[in-house]
Amino acid sequence: ISRKDAAGLLELLRDQEEITVTFDAESRVTRNCTTYNIVGRIPGKHPDRMVLLSAHYDSYFDGFQDDNTAVALMFGIAKALLDSGFQPNNTIVICAMASEEWGVVDSNFDWSTGAYEQIFTAHPEWVGKVIADLNFELPALAHGTRARIRSCYEYVSFLEEYLADLPNLTIAYPEETAVTSPIETWSDDFSMAIAGVPSMVNDFTGGSFMETHYHSQFDNDEFYDEQVYRLHHELFALLILALDETAVVPLQFSPVVQRIRKGLEQC
């Protein structure tokens, strides 16, 4: 609710512990609309082997963090790669996804529709060609005490080795960057992963912002953190370079088997 309405409720609660109110809201849904995923490429020496960068451009209200800064981050990384004269081995695909926040009527599973349709309907041939999806969410905001890359199990070992060999990056958190797994259903990397594309995302679910400002009119530039934003540019641009140097896709399947075994033992 708005600050104005909240102030009125707080005033009513000044002299009593609880009150009963009537909430009157009207939502209008326009059915059968078309949205567009927007795709660009930096051609590589091997056009059929790709690294995908993804972020969604739809939002609730202004969506400054969620997810406009992420779309801008993709452009920033792409510009840095081009300006550096980098000639990738893999084709770098940049995809601004639609319908992440909402895209299906009459369903409990109404989000990440654009990404789902991108990989299952528009480009199912990407499976087996995209060696990694680097998805971005709320990248200009501090989440907890460290940056984290939330990854599918198969990339954890490679990412841990990558982080161990990193040069000094912009200092934005008191603790060192870490890897966590598995991925979650909150974001577009999940739709990619269930199709068979190994995926990861900057971890974004920690911190009070998610409880007080997420998906509200308060998601604006007031919470812009330049140091965190710079760190994510550096962290993922260098990750693209590291992935591009691999002759064989660096997937490690033993963590998946271990997780399956653990799940069976708990049954």
What is the role of each PLM region?
Residues 7, 15-23, 29-39, 53, ...:
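Hydrophobic, small-residue-rich alpha-helical packing segments that form membrane-like cores
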Residues 1, 21-23, 38-41, 50-54, ...:
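Structural recognition of the beta-strand scaffold that forms the well-ordered cores
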Residues 59-154:
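Acidic/histidine-rich catalytic neighborhood of metal-dependent amide-processing enzymes
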Residues 1-65, 75-86:
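Soluble metallo-hydrolase cores and metallopeptidase-like ectodomains found primarily
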